[in-house]
Amino acid sequence: MPKGPKQQPPEPEWIGDGEGTSPADKVVKKGKKDKKTKKTFFEELAVEDKQAGEEEKLQKEKEQQQQQQQQKKKRDTRKGRRKKDVDDDSDERVLMERLKQLSVPASDEEDEVPAPIPRGRKKAKGGNVFEALIQDDSEEEEEEEENRVLKPAKPEKNRINKAVAEEPPGLRSKKGKEEKSKGKAKSKPAAADSEGEEEEEDTAKEKEPPQQGKDRDKKEAEQGSGEEKEEKEGDLKANDPYANLSKKEKKKLKKQMDYERQVESLKAANAAENDFSVSQAEVSSRQAMLENASDIKLEKFSISAHGKELFVNADLYIVAGRRYGLVGPNGKGKTTLLKHIANRALSIPPNIDVLLCEQEVVADETPAVQAVLRADTKRLRLLEEERRLQGQLEQGDDTAAEKLEKVYEELRATGAAAAEAKARRILAGLGFDPEMQNRPTQKFSGGWRMRVSLARALFMEPTLLMLDEPTNHLDLNAVIWLNNYLQGWRKTLLIVSHDQGFLDDVCTDIIHLDTQRLHYYRGNYMTFKKMYQQKQKELLKQYEKQEKKLKELKAGGKSTKQAEKQTKEVLTRKQQKCRRKNQDEESQEPPELLKRPKEYTVRFTFPDPPPLSPPVLGLHGVTFGYEGQKPLFKNLDFGIDMDSRICIVGPNGVGKSTLLLLLTGKLTPTNGEMRKNHRLKIGFFNQQYAEQLHMEETPTEYLQRSFNLPYQDARKCLGRFGLESHAHTIQICKLSGGQKARVVFAELACREPDVLILDEPTNNLDIESIDALGEAINDYKGAVIVVSHDARLITETNCQLWVVEEQGVSQIDGDFDDYKREVLEALGEVMVNRPRD
């Protein structure tokens, strides 16, 4: 056996320990001195404080900085990365000044290296001041604390903690923030101490007596295997950034990551809409198991925009294969919900592909039909692969034949051969004739490019297709085709529309947005309307019963507050009973007293005109065409009476709006004339109604100036057409499209017209307002001429259908269903007669 180092007398080792003795020697030798003299820990600190001088402090700071740099290089090499060097001198000075303020001697204890303890014993956090101040500041420091063993120095730690606790709160919080922001930099001296432990222990081993050296060798052999295991565990934890996090910390981190992902998704999708905030309950274990399900189940999500809460703890349930209509008053968040689903700001199952049709296609040289076909990227990829393999086959590569056969099989499975026919069928249904289908998209207006975008969405057939007011840019013929086409849609559909007839024919379910929640009704819109009215009646009965109970309690001597409290207690007991019955473990909101159900009612009224002798208006021998174009009309000849109810129909571009302008006198015929009663007053609602408004005025000022009305009368007129009171005094330029439309209707009523000529009046109106408009037309005693794509408005007002075709106008024999059948037959479609739920 090799001889151990010569035993050294213990006394000289304590002389000049700051110069010739390593920190490890001091730890071991001071332990012996403690046993002999039995001095307390604080006495030892006092002695050491006197022995340490300013030169020793500077020397140790330099040594500490060198050890820190060595440790940083080793860590960078081990983890395979290099980080930027951080200068910790200022941080150490701050801590040294803090230690001086706390009256804690930091000259020796600061540089002590804890002696290792045998494996299996509990590791005690030692007297390293840096650790005592910044423990648990970072995940990296926690890993280092697990891989090193500290010498017990509990009295010092307690003393420091006590001193910190006695520090003024303001100073402590301020310094705490500084330390927390620099936690990683401050943890490096302690890590450097543990890194240099091996060299210091070798030095101490050489100075030990032979017997102690043997014992130490034995202990190190026992500890070696334990340290290797700990080192492996440390490497595993270093690779796993979440290994040292508690369950609570992991849960918090997951929420933060989900929130950041949602925010980034919204910013990427629409940078202009950065005022939205979204929150959603965590995905339950059952939902996690159903990530590959075809249904959507979102529970307790909230959405706010510009500080206004749109959804609060709402639930979204969408079953695959159902066709949903999302309804509710304007401005309550319907479009916002569709955008959040499309941007995946909410937790949509990853296997569900979602498409929201909201933007028109790019205007370029691409023909309309090719713009639709290029939406199918899978088909394009297979066709490109087919061309490449055919080229290889022609060059004599026999291996390409087998691959080419597989490509053919995939093309047949996706129906690639019928893709162009399908695209042309959709475009034809939306109003594109063969010449228009091959026309570049840059030659179309915005409305027609929006139709191309809708055609692309229908052609792609996503798992969940969302349409926001799809009929707004369509004429009646296109609406009839789309209505019929979507009745055969086999995938999931979510529609926002104000066309009640469209919702009745297409939808199998209705989602009602009310009081920041989503309520579900099975059936079409008509079924929902009946069920909702019944629900409102029941709520009104419950409210009246509650008010009666409150009156009885007040009559019995209870105060209003006491009566309400007692009523709430009764509701709470009922809620708890219902919860136990349904075994609902989730916490529910505390019950509140019922409020009187609010009925959203809108009533349009037009004053009845005086009687006029017929005909009041007509076109006689009229021919008209725009300059440089072929004539739209030839030899028009018809008259209108006071009891006429006429709806002008036909595809886009045949001249429906032009015919209305001829009747109002805004266009002069090329030949012939427009005749009208000299007392006739015409009220005209134009699609571009915003052009006739003065945007800088308020609605009240506009009516007062136009008709010399008193202030209160102007506001009453606006209120009758459903314009909210707060919007009466806002500049017209700041109103929404629906609010501007109501101002125009109020202006029409103030004009007291004898004939109403309405060009697409339902655009930007909600369903309740369209119903009110239909009732107003039925009550009106004057003539009505309307161009509309809303089938229900046409049928509810019993309008005669005049179709514009072949440069003329003719009346249709039959009702609206006959016209629908005629339109579909002309397109080669079969009319779907789906039984309504």
Curated annotation (Swiss-Prot):
ATP 1 binds at G328, P329, N330, G331, K332, G333, K334, T335. GO terms for molecular function: ATP binding; ATP hydrolysis activity; ribosome binding; translation activator activity. Transmembrane segments: none annotated. ATP 2 binds at G650, P651, N652, G653, V654, G655, K656, S657. The modification Phosphoserine is found at S22, S90, S103, S107, S138, S194, S225, S587. Phosphorylated at phosphoserine and phosphothreonine. Phosphorylation on Ser-107 and Ser-138 by CK2; inhibits association of EIF2 with ribosomes. Residues 29-39, 71-83 have a biased composition (Basic residues). Residues 134-146, 194-203 have a biased composition (Acidic residues). The keyword Nucleotide-binding applies. Residues 47-64, 147-159, 204-238, 551-572 have a biased composition (Basic and acidic residues). GO terms for cellular component: cytoplasm; cytosol; nuclear envelope; nucleoplasm. Its main location: cytoplasm. InterPro entries: AAA+_ATPase, ABC_transporter-like_ATP-bd, ABC_transporter-like_CS, ABCF_EF3_subfamily, P-loop_NTPase. Residues 296-540, 617-832 form the ABC transporter domain. Interacts (via N-terminus) with EIF2S1; the interaction is independent of its phosphorylated status. Associates (via both ABC transporter domains) with the ribosomes. Required for efficient Cap- and IRES-mediated mRNA translation initiation. Not involved in the ribosome biogenesis. Belongs to the ABC transporter superfamily. ABCF family. EF3 subfamily. This is ATP-binding cassette sub-family F member 1. The gene is Abcf1.
